[in-house]
Amino acid sequence: MLANIVNKFIALILAFLMSIGIITPTPIPPGGIEASVELNFANDEKASAAGTLTVTSNYDAEYSVYWGTLGGEKLTTYSESGKTVPYTEFAKVTVKDGEGEKELNSFLAIPQNAKTILLYYDDQLVDTETLPLGKTFAYGAETYSFGSLSDVHFNRYYDEAGNDISQTSYPRALNFLDDMGVSIVGVSGDLSKEGEDSAYVSFNKYNSEHDFNVFTCKGNHDCKDKFNYETWKENINVGVFSDNKPDGVLAVSDNGYDFVYSGKETHGDVFIFFSQITDKYLPFVQLVTDEQLDWLETQLETYKDKRVYLYFHTFLNAPSGNPFLGEGNIYNDYGLFYILPYFTGNKDEKRFRGLLTEYKNVIFFNGHSHWTYSMEEYNENLNITDYDGTTATMVHVSSSAAPRTTSITQPIQHSNPGTMSEGLYLNVYPDFVISNACDFVNGQILAYATYKIDK
């Protein structure tokens, strides 16, 4: 770790000295940059980008790699209203002494309509490689699409004028997902700062502007002192716990929070929303009750032959090795991490983990840490993992309000309200799901966090 920190600091110092003219940057060769990119695939599976990227060049620098069209243009897609939605780079590779490599996430997807790999130095296209025919294919007819959000946090982050940033970030996220044509949106909790009524009223107000259902569970901030159940029931998951339930509500728990939904728009897929009951992350303090876990186990057993999306707020530590290198967390240059995971070894945590190990048909959405998707550089499991096929597929949902970053010059986690806002747009097909991480501020898909889930 120390060597890594030293190398990063040296690189930063050199970059700074170059920027102020003390050190002259290495000039580009007189004949220009001559570079090539190669993706050595790890498997023959269509649409899987798993493998190793190798960039060779006569000029040492950082290069960006994009998916492209046959015409050599960066890949884009379109919203239902006709807006162009660009894909970002899917990898960055640093070339040193003429060569650089990057191992790609085993879940990384080749987007539909991608035909080439484009290598860029800054804004200059320096190489184009055609994807093998066996790796590109038309996904076929999409069954439906949906959105996943988390950590909305009304009343927590304010701009310099005193405006609640979530009054902008949340409706913008919903508008983006609506324009992409989603049929339903699931949220992994933390709608508020301290459980205050106004947060839930705002959440309901923006949801009511759209024709699709928006369902959620509770997060730790929704378990704080200002929480009032009647306000929650009136504004959140509206009607689910009434005598006049929305069509598609298959089961509700006696606790007034947890429920199962499978409507016409989900085409047989099952959505489960499962709420924690406390904001305390301590030994022997249960996030969920035994009765909740009994109920959850019953639902998972009932729908074990279905594709199930389980929404919960808090992520779990890795089952082995460094506990902070599991889905939902990172371990930065200084050994720092997000300090509030589901407390490993607690009675409820062990049972919950056991259920996620047994029912591998589940896709488990959780938020809580706010880590931005690019922080995958610190942990390949941050955004998605199934721990080599031993568990349900666990999927990190960043924050629509304030994604967090860290770096060599930013040892402590830094929140980015206003300048960043992220979430997921998911395309569902008969045999797989494509999970697209989204940058709602710039209206783009983060290609480095676009994944294929075979379920």
Residue map of PLM features:
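Active-site glycine-centered loops adjacent to acidic/histidine catalytic or metal-binding residues
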Residues: 151, 189-190, 219-220, 313, ...
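Extended active-site neighborhood of metal-dependent phosphoesterases/phosphodiesterases
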Residues: 197-303, 351, 357-358, 374, ...
